[in-house]
Amino acid sequence: MENMRFSLKALRINKGLRQTDLAVELGVSRKTVAAWENGKSYPAADKIDGICKALGVGYDNIKWKA
């Protein structure tokens, strides 16, 4: 069975979070979250675990834009 993968934005919206909510939880700016969602930058390793916890998913369930 293949793992289901969803975009960071879709997961955030599904969780009922605004970019600002996720940013505050992770200690980054809203613009940083927007850049991650748009594939303009990639989260640092120390933020990835927090993203997964905040969204309630594993790393393999997030479709990271390159």
Predicted regions, residues:
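Alpha-helical residues within the helix-turn-helix
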Residues: 13, 24, 53
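Key DNA-contact positions within bacterial/archaeal DNA-binding proteins
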Residues: 31, 41, 60
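Short alpha-helical DNA-recognition segment
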Residues: 16-35
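A short, Lys/Arg-rich alpha-helix, primarily the initiator
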Residues: 1-14
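Residue-level signal for the short linker/turn that defines the boundary of a DNA-recognition helix
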Residues: 6, 17, 43-46
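DNA major-groove recognition helix of helix-turn-helix/homeodomain DNA-binding modules
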Residues: 44-61
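Residues in the recognition helix of alpha-helical DNA-binding motifs
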Residues: 11, 25, 36, 65
